[in-house]
Amino acid sequence: DGDLMEGISYEAASFAGNLKLGKLIVLYDSNKSTRDSNTNKTFTESVSSRFASAGWQVLYVKKGTSITEINKAIIKAKKNQNMPSIIIVNTVIGEGSKLEGNSSIYSGELTKDDYEQIKRGLGVEGLPFTLLKEPAENIRNQVVNRGTSLNDEWDKIYSEYKKEMNSNEVLEFESLIYNSINFDLTKVDFDINYEQKETLRESNSKVMNIISNSIWNFVGGNADTSSSTLAYLNGKEDISYSNFKGKNILYGVRENACGAISNGLALSGFLPFASTFMAFSDYMKPSIRMSAFMNLPVTYIFTHDSITNSFDGPTHQPVEQLASLRAMPNLYVYRPADI
């Protein structure tokens, strides 16, 4: 429940619905509790209506402890390739304990009495926790066999695809899925015709487009600011529901989701960039921190970095943003000038 209260969740949901990302399935653990209270005090909107209006398929699981129900919902979600799906799984926090349904169990601990009460409810009172070797091996073997079967199936399909691909396409695809892309910027021709007077945004745009022509997995987008930041890959098309071959992502005014999605792209083998005005980097700060934590190769491009180059007033004029970015561990911050 708490996750869906966050602004980033709505940004991402709106973005996914707009692109009709039919392979996206979200399982929502709806126990109607957060750390401080039950959601009847803080979160009374209709989540199903919100997601439906954003273009999502909404499915329900009445009993969250039913693996069968959950499995049926996932199977149904997979069949819909034209809409992302959210599965609302109704659960009871602290089920079986004395604090069942009480938000205090959210971050609290079970007492010994609670523990014993739950065991009585499950019919295992008096039995110590144990995991016998034989059933443990059976579970392990099932997982291994399932994975082996799926891998063999994938290899078979991929071998058929490879027959239709040239050697460069195979190399690019395999370097992407195995996250082993290598490139040498020293071999890139940066013979750029700089104007005598041009903004760094214009210079950066020229560099980005040269890199894009040399590094095929360099993709990214703006939070509705590309016409100003100029962080756009010319001639590379925009990604849309009808065309996922583009290299430009139109995030709309969704800075938080822009940063988070860029992290996901980096984890999937791409070299993404994310851009907006410097003052709005604050909206991306949680995602930037995660990039730094995980050593992800995300390039954040922030323009309009001075109070002197924005005609929109104080809301668009950065003051403390540069210092806060420089204070972040494992984040390289460059501010070129007078080149």
Mark where each language-model region is.
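Intrinsically disordered, low-complexity segments enriched in small/flexible residues
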Residues: D1, I105, I192-Q196
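Thiamine diphosphate
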Residues: E137-V144, T148-I339
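Glycine-rich ThDP/TPP pyrophosphate-binding loop and its adjacent helix/strand module
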Residues: G2-Q142, A327-I339
